[in-house]
C-alpha cells in the first residue's frame, strides 16, 4: 500500500454544505478504489499566493490516503473537471505524521507557559 497526502483548494465562495459534499465525494472515490482515508483536515479559508481564476482566497482540505496508485489517477481525473476546485496536489510519502496539524493554532496553555518561562507578557 502506498501513502499519499492529497490537498484540494476549493473556490472561496463555496458554501460549507458544498465543502462537505466535496469531502464525501472524494472519500467515496477513495473507498471505491480499495483505498482508505486515514485522516481528513479542513484547513479553512486561506489566502492564495496569487490570483487563480479571479479568486484571492481558497478553502483548503487535506487528506491522508492509504491505497494503490490508481486511487490518485481516479481522484485527479474527477478533480480536473470539477468547477468548484481551483487546484489539487498529491504527494507520495513514506509515513504519515498523524499528530501534526499543519495549520492548527497553538493551545492557549502552551502560549501562557511560554510567556511564563521566558518572562514575556
Swiss-Prot record:
- Its domain of life reads Bacteria
**InterPro entries to which the protein is assigned, alphabetical:** Ribosomal_bS6, Ribosomal_bS6_sf, Ribosomal_S6_plastid/chlpt, Transl_elong_EF1B/ribsomal_bS6
Any idea which GO molecular function terms this record carries? small ribosomal subunit rRNA binding; structural constituent of ribosome
A Gene Ontology biological process in which this protein takes part is: translation
Enumerate the SUPFAM superfamilies for this protein.
Ribosomal protein S6
Q: What does this protein do?
A: Binds together with bS18 to 16S ribosomal RNA.
PANTHER family membership? MITOCHONDRIAL 28S RIBOSOMAL PROTEIN S6 (PTHR21011), SMALL RIBOSOMAL SUBUNIT PROTEIN BS6M (PTHR21011:SF1)
Record-given protein name: Small ribosomal subunit protein bS6
Annotated source species? Pelagibacter ubique (strain HTCC1062)
Upper lineage is: Bacteria, Pseudomonadati, Pseudomonadota, Alphaproteobacteria, Candidatus Pelagibacterales
